[in-house]
């Protein structure tokens, strides 16, 4: 090997040699797989080759100095763990694989130890574009710590780690973060849901974000997920630079699953392209394949010489030169035939069938496929498009031919096949890892070199369990059994394959373009299942990163799940294959598997999507080829001989075309397919499922005109063989289905990336429920027409979850759409899960609770549900949850012919989607036709109506009050809220008849403003009358009370007219007659005599009123009105009025106008009634209804009156009453202290000994009027003034002394009169009931006397 130096641009000087391997050091891929080769790849770092110098201690291989410069993509491989030689090739290498490296001219890569601090790492470069560390793009190092990064964006993000500024603050908990994405991930912790669930057996932990889940896996399950740089946003195949950059494909990421002990702080995964080239070179060195085809090869042979070279060129092992490229790698001129430009991102699919398990007769347990996005599209990095030069790659260099000796026939390591990508899909490369038996056969490789002739495999007895078909999302054309490889190139390629010649040139249309008659994937599947020990290499070394919108953390988590569970489910296969954009014009998705898979283990119960090899169905159902290449107006080609596999693992031949097959195998004949794909790809963000599951209403039939039982459309509830989604709909739940069986919504490769695994959490765990805050925020979405898929935007709920929430389409019927070839509105009901999920028919918002949807509907005030149910909320899990919703019925019946429509049931009622406390009143339909939980009508209804243009709904007329409720009272006619939501009333809405709208519930029990509603008895209702045909109390989740009568009640707004509502106005008369007109009212009081002018008379009248309000009067203490009436009858004579009150009583004849007049306080309360009132008052406070029920002899009005009279006469506080006894005990001591505080002269002190008495806080004037004889007189003003001057403040009324003036002023309020009435009752509320003696004494006096 020549000495070379690529310059000093790189920040990390390194040494690299490619010495030859000895025969004993050959890499054995089977051992590699068995020994977990993949986890050790994380120990390698990357650095530019600009500073590489040869290592003099290593032998120089026979290789030119420009090899690495041209073919290693200017990247070198370092060991980040122990700085040894390349671990990938040395640690797990054996002699045979080392010899193969030596034959290929690939020596041992010697890496220099990385600088301290991990200068060669680019661990922070996880987001943004990764640039090549080439002399044109030198590595960028951190000026603070010296770490090396391949892009400026990675370096800028790394500098944040050195900064202490945290400008992104959480508004909820005020926690600050340096980066916005960290804050976004932190916000997930404030949700009430934990969608990231550990699916290890026996572990039920769940977390809010993927970081916590990853940490959980590392700590508890010993699994470690590496972070990586996400795939860069690459240009589509139609961009001009896609062809120019064929020699240097963009780097792509590689994820690995390693034990915690294998991690190193600054390590980064090895470059995937480099590793793939190296291993592909090794494999194809060992793979027996024919030599280069002669220049004059026939069309059929040229078609089959797609991969005559043993090594892969670029990222594809079968990458022939384009029509404009020099065929140096093949040393032959390949036929040039124009093909369509690339339209879809490339996709790498990897398979690792193991024949050993099949040979042993034991089925290998299936392994969960990587995340649904794991096999996402990739762009130009994966294949070399048409017109690009052949990228020279190890070990096939420009101008070199591979000698036959470099292809040994005997080998014991697994061979890997890197099939080229389709030119229109930018390299759908497929890795196939297969371990043949010890004695491989060469006759297949010697026979006609078909598209997969370079990847021979051996046929083994099929395993009884789930084969590789359960796990591999591509047909068997990739796995050619050597013994069955057709020798006839024409038969191998197929006569009806017009694109066969292109398989040689432009990546040979690699993705699953298999020909009729070729052995399908079943032969390879019969060779055995995927071994558990092959998973590390399968997942870590060759798994490509996804299209730019894919979250790389999700891939890591799913790889971790894959390793821990080792279960491949059909649902996951379908989900993954749905992410594989197939080449336009290629045969579309595979048919689903027939049969319910009775032999599968429980985890595989929901797995339905399997892979059936065949010319017409080379792709898995649900794949983009099947989802996107759906042009109903274009005839499909159905190829006979479709190889299918039954549930027992055997082969099953059925001439069944794909339901959504491509129009033709020749893309040139269907140019609108690529335009359709481009249109779909141009949509921003996430596409609605209607973009991905076009339910066209057309069902492809066989050539003979029959429709197979399994050929049902997506969106059709069919038996288990019709798709994973239909099985999921039927409730067959499984771990893989519930955790990883979702479909990834494809987006624009150029669309902005969203970081974090939370973008994919809905796909990871479709059972996750929305938190109440999410439902509340999402409920504010405005109503509107169906969102345009090309302008689809993320809802609030999806933004919270990172932008990848399922935006379900409206339940539409697509017969008319199929006629127009419109693919934008599909019905994805076959994709549902057995969990109740509700979708707003107006805005496609998804809700996990019925209450969330019902509350959300109240915000669509201008677009309420139609009474005919044209727009129904979609219900997930039709077998499980049908609460007040109609189950969305897929198009037609399962047995109906294609395109048949079911007429809409005119009596099918709409779902009740109303907020709480809103009445529902139907108009024209009977109660039996309502939609309160009638699933039958809902299931029979198709989704046709919502495809029509939505019309604004009119507000329905308000409902009416019904008959008396359970309590015996008429239900109120109050209405709430402003709109009376009633989807059962002709779809018409009216405003509330009352202004302003009442706030109380319209159906509440009890009286209201509009109490007794008069019911009309007319049999025919006028336009303003409604039939109140209500149901019983509806679902408790709604909280709706409904009326149960069928009376016809008019609730039209009107003005109440009549003597009951308006006063009668007398006729107008002359003013002169007013003086002679006698007043109809009786005069009961007027000032007599000189009462208006004489002050003495006024004083006498005032004294009479005071006496009448005192306890002297038997009638009560506040009968001022009675005193005035008596004074009026006495014509102003105060003495006569007083005698009337005291002696005779105010007795009036029956003819008197006031004979039946009831005076306040005139009721007589017996002692028993008083005692009961006190007990009731202490027990119920001011609830006079309960007091009345306890007394039973007094009405509520009498109890209220007694309370207020009592309150005026006695100042009591029932809350402080229990402390009276303590107060009584303290008052004697207060008296003593008061006497000590009262200042007096020394000579007065001996003669003054006041008698101690209880100083209650009642209105006691007796303390002044009737003090003991030996008590001194009141303090003189001088004495009081001197006392105040000394800081002592005595009361002038009761001689209490206070230390503060404020205390005395507050105390003086007790001595004030209430309403000019002298408080006479001076007895405080006793704690104990009154003694009978006291009651007897008080029974003779008035009701307020004690």
Curated annotation (Swiss-Prot):
<feature type="domain" description="SANT">
    <location>
        <begin position="1160"/>
        <end position="1211"/>
    </location>
</feature>
<dbReference type="GO" id="GO:0003714">
    <property type="term" value="F:transcription corepressor activity"/>
</dbReference>
<keyword id="KW-0677">Repeat</keyword>
<dbReference type="InterPro" id="IPR001005">
    <property type="entry name" value="SANT/Myb"/>
</dbReference>
<keyword id="KW-0862">Zinc</keyword>
<feature type="zinc finger region" description="C2H2-type 5">
    <location>
        <begin position="1289"/>
        <end position="1311"/>
    </location>
</feature>
<dbReference type="GO" id="GO:0007283">
    <property type="term" value="P:spermatogenesis"/>
</dbReference>
<dbReference type="GO" id="GO:0045892">
    <property type="term" value="P:negative regulation of DNA-templated transcription"/>
</dbReference>
<feature type="compositionally biased region" description="Polar residues">
    <location>
        <begin position="671"/>
        <end position="685"/>
    </location>
</feature>
<dbReference type="GO" id="GO:0005634">
    <property type="term" value="C:nucleus"/>
</dbReference>
<feature type="compositionally biased region" description="Basic residues">
    <location>
        <begin position="1248"/>
        <end position="1258"/>
    </location>
</feature>
<feature type="region of interest" description="Disordered">
    <location>
        <begin position="931"/>
        <end position="971"/>
    </location>
</feature>
<feature type="region of interest" description="Disordered">
    <location>
        <begin position="283"/>
        <end position="328"/>
    </location>
</feature>
<keyword id="KW-0221">Differentiation</keyword>
<keyword id="KW-0804">Transcription</keyword>
<feature type="zinc finger region" description="C2H2-type 3">
    <location>
        <begin position="196"/>
        <end position="220"/>
    </location>
</feature>
<feature type="region of interest" description="Disordered">
    <location>
        <begin position="1"/>
        <end position="34"/>
    </location>
</feature>
<feature type="domain" description="ELM2">
    <location>
        <begin position="1053"/>
        <end position="1145"/>
    </location>
</feature>
<feature type="compositionally biased region" description="Basic and acidic residues">
    <location>
        <begin position="1234"/>
        <end position="1247"/>
    </location>
</feature>
<feature type="region of interest" description="Disordered">
    <location>
        <begin position="437"/>
        <end position="472"/>
    </location>
</feature>
<keyword id="KW-0469">Meiosis</keyword>
<dbReference type="InterPro" id="IPR017884">
    <property type="entry name" value="SANT_dom"/>
</dbReference>
<feature type="compositionally biased region" description="Basic and acidic residues">
    <location>
        <begin position="934"/>
        <end position="948"/>
    </location>
</feature>
<keyword id="KW-0539">Nucleus</keyword>
<feature type="compositionally biased region" description="Polar residues">
    <location>
        <begin position="1264"/>
        <end position="1273"/>
    </location>
</feature>
<dbReference type="GO" id="GO:0006357">
    <property type="term" value="P:regulation of transcription by RNA polymerase II"/>
</dbReference>
<protein>
    <recommendedName>
        <fullName>Zinc finger protein 541</fullName>
    </recommendedName>
</protein>
<dbReference type="Pfam" id="PF01448">
    <property type="entry name" value="ELM2"/>
</dbReference>
<dbReference type="InterPro" id="IPR036236">
    <property type="entry name" value="Znf_C2H2_sf"/>
</dbReference>
<feature type="zinc finger region" description="C2H2-type 1">
    <location>
        <begin position="140"/>
        <end position="162"/>
    </location>
</feature>
<keyword id="KW-0217">Developmental protein</keyword>
<feature type="region of interest" description="Disordered">
    <location>
        <begin position="235"/>
        <end position="271"/>
    </location>
</feature>
<dbReference type="GO" id="GO:0006355">
    <property type="term" value="P:regulation of DNA-templated transcription"/>
</dbReference>
<dbReference type="Pfam" id="PF13912">
    <property type="entry name" value="zf-C2H2_6"/>
</dbReference>
<keyword id="KW-0805">Transcription regulation</keyword>
<keyword id="KW-0678">Repressor</keyword>
<dbReference type="GO" id="GO:0030154">
    <property type="term" value="P:cell differentiation"/>
</dbReference>
<feature type="zinc finger region" description="C2H2-type 4">
    <location>
        <begin position="838"/>
        <end position="860"/>
    </location>
</feature>
<dbReference type="GO" id="GO:0007140">
    <property type="term" value="P:male meiotic nuclear division"/>
</dbReference>
<feature type="compositionally biased region" description="Polar residues">
    <location>
        <begin position="21"/>
        <end position="32"/>
    </location>
</feature>
<dbReference type="Pfam" id="PF00096">
    <property type="entry name" value="zf-C2H2"/>
</dbReference>
<dbReference type="GO" id="GO:0008270">
    <property type="term" value="F:zinc ion binding"/>
</dbReference>
């Amino acid at each position: 090997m020549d000495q070379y130096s690529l310059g000093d641009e790189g920040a990390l000087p390194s040494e690299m040699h490619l010495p030859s391997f000895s025969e004993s050091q050959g890499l054995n891929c089977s051992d590699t797989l068995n020994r977990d080769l993949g986890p050790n790849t994380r120990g390698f770092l990357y650095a530019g080759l600009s500073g590489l110098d040869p290592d003099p201690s290593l032998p120089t291989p026979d290789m030119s100095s420009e090899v690495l410069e041209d073919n290693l993509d200017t990247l070198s491989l370092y060991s980040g763990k122990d700085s040894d030689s390349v671990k990938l090739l040395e640690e797990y290498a054996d002699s045979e694989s080392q010899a193969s490296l030596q034959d290929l001219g690939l020596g041992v890569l010697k890496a220099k130890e990385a600088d301290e601090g991990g200068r060669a790492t680019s661990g922070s470069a996880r987001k943004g574009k990764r640039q090549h560390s080439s002399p044109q793009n030198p590595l960028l190092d951190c000026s603070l710590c010296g770490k090396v990064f391949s892009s400026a964006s990675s370096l800028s993000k790394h500098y944040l780690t050195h900064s202490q500024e945290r400008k992104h603050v959480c508004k909820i908990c005020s926690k600050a973060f340096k980066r916005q994405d960290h804050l976004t991930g932190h916000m997930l912790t404030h949700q009430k849901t934990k969608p990231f669930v550990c699916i290890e057996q026996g572990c039920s932990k769940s977390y809010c974000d993927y970081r916590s889940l990853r940490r959980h896996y590392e700590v508890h399950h010993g699994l470690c997920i590496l972070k990586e740089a996400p795939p860069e946003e690459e240009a589509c195949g139609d961009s001009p630079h896609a062809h120019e950059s064929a020699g240097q494909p963009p780097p792509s990421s590689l994820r690995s699953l390693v034990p915690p002990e294998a991690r190193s702080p600054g390590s980064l995964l090895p470059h995937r392209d480099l590793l793939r080239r190296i291993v592909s070179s090794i494999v194809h060195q060992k793979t027996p394949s024919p030599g280069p085809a002669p220049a004059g090869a026939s069309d059929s042979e040229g078609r089959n010489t797609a991969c005559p070279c043993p090594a892969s060129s670029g990222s594809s092992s079968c990458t022939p030169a384009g029509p404009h490229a020099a065929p140096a790698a093949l040393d032959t001129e390949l036929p040039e035939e124009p093909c369509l430009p690339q339209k879809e991102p490339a996709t790498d699919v990897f398979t690792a069938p193991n024949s050993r398990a099949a040979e042993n007769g034991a089925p290998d347990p299936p392994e969960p496929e990587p995340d649904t996005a794991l096999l996402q599209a990739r762009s130009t990095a994966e294949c070399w498009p048409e017109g690009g030069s052949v990228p020279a790659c190890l070990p096939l260099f420009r101008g070199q031919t591979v000698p036959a000796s470099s292809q040994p026939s005997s080998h014991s390591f697994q061979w890997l096949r890197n099939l080229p990508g389709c030119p229109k899909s930018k390299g759908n490369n497929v890795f196939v890892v297969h371990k043949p038996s010890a004695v491989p056969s060469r006759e297949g490789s010697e026979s006609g070199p078909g598209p997969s002739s370079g990847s021979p495999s051996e046929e083994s007895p099929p395993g009884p369990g789930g084969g590789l078909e359960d796990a591999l999302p591509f047909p068997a054309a990739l796995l050619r059994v050597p013994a069955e490889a057709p020798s006839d190139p024409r038969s191998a390629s197929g006569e009806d394959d017009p694109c066969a010649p292109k398989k040689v040139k432009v990546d040979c249309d690699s993705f699953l373009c298999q020909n009729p008659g070729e052995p399908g994937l079943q032969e390879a599947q019969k060779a055995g299942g995927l071994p558990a020990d092959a998973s590390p290499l399968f997942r870590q070394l060759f798994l490509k990163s996804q299209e730019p919108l894919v979250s790389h953390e999700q891939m890591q988590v799913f790889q971790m799940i894959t390793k821990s569970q080792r279960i491949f489910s059909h649902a996951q296969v379908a989900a993954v294959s749905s992410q594989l954009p197939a080449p336009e014009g290629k045969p579309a998705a595979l048919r689903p598997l027939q049969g319910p898979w009775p032999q599968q283990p429980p985890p595989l119960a929901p797995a339905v999507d399997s892979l059936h090899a065949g010319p017409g169905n080379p792709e898995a159902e649900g794949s983009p080829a099947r989802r996107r290449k759906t042009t109903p107006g274009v005839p499909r080609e159905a190829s006979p001989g479709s190889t299918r596999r039954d549930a027992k693992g055997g082969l099953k031949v059925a001439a069944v075309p794909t339901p959504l097959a491509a129009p033709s195998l020749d893309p040139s004949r269907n140019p609108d397919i690529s335009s359709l794909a481009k249109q779909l790809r141009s949509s921003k963000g996430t596409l609605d499922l209607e973009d991905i599951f076009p339910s066209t209403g057309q069902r492809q039939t066989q050539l003979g005109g029959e429709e197979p039982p399994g050929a049902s459309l997506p969106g059709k509830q069919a038996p288990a063989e019709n798709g994973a989604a239909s099985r999921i709909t039927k409730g067959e739940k499984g771990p893989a289905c519930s955790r990883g069986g979702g479909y990834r919504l494809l987006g624009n490769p150029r669309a902005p990336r969203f970081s974090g695994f939370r973008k994919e959490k809905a796909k990871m765990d479709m059972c996750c429920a929305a938190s109440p805050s999410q439902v509340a925020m999402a409920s504010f979405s405005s109503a509107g027409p169906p969102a345009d898929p090309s302008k689809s935007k993320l809802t609030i709920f999806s933004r919270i979850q990172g932008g990848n929430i399922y935006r379900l389409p409206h339940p539409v019927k697509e017969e008319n759409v199929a006629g127009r070839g419109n693919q934008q509105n599909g019905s994805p009901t076959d994709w549902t899960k057995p969990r109740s999920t509700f979708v707003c028919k107006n805005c496609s918002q998804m809700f996990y609770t019925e209450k969330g949807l019902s509350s959300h509907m109240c915000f669509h005030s201008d677009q309420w549900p139609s009474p005919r149910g044209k727009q129904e909320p979609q219900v997930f899990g039709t077998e499980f949850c049908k609460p007040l919703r109609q189950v969305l019925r897929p198009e037609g019946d399962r047995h109906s012919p294609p395109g048949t429509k079911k007429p809409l049931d005119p009596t099918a009622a709409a779902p009740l989607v109303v907020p709480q406390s809103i009445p529902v009143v139907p108009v024209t339909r009977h109660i039996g036709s309502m939609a309160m939980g009638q699933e039958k009508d809902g299931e029979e209804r198709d989704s046709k109506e919502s495809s029509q243009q939505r019309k604004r709904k009119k507000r329905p007329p308000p409902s009416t009050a019904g008959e008396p409720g359970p309590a015996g009272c008429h239900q109120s006619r109050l209405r709430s809220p402003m709109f009376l939501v009633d989807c059962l009333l002709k779809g018409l809405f009216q405003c509330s008849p009352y202004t302003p709208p009442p706030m109380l519930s319209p159906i509440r029990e009890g009286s209201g403003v509009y109490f007794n509603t008069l019911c009309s008895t007319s049999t025919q209702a006028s336009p303003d009358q409604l039939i109140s045909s209500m149901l019983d109390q509806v679902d408790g989740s709604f909280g709706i009370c409904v009326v149960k009568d069928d009376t016809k009640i008019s609730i039209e707004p009107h003005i109440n007219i009549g003597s009951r509502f308006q006063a009668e106005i007398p006729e107008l008369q002359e003013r002169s007659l007013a003086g002679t007109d006698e007043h109809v009212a009786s005069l009961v009081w007027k000032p007599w005599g000189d009462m208006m002018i004489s002050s003495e008379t006024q004083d006498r009248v005032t004294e009479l009123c005071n006496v009448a309000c005192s306890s002297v009067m038997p009638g009560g203490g506040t009968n001022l009105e009675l005193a005035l009436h008596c004074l009026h009858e006495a014509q102003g004579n105060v003495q006569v009025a007083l005698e009337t009150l005291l002696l005779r009583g105010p007795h009036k004849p029956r003819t008197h106008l006031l004979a039946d007049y009831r005076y306040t306080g005139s009721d007589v309360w017996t002692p028993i009634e008083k005692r009961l009132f006190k007990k009731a008052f202490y027990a119920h406070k001011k609830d006079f209804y309960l007091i009345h029920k306890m007394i039973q002899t007094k009405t509520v009005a009498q109890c209220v009156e007694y309370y207020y009279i009592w309150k005026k006469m006695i100042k009591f506080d029932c809350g402080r009453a229990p402390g009276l006894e303590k107060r009584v005990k303290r008052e004697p001591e207060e008296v003593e202290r008061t006497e000590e505080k009262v200042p007096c002269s020394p000579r007065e002190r001996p003669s003054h000994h006041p008698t101690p008495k209880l100083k209650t806080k009642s209105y006691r004037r007796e303390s002044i009027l009737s003090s003991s004889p030996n008590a001194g007189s009141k303090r003189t003003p001088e004495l009081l003034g001197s006392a105040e001057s000394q800081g002592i403040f005595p009361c002038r009324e009761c001689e209490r002394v206070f230390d503060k003036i404020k205390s005395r002023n507050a105390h003086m309020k007790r001595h004030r009169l209430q309403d000019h009435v002298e408080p006479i009752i001076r007895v405080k509320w006793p704690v104990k009931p009154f003694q009978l003696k006291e009651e007897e004494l008080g029974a003779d006096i008035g009701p307020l006397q004690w």
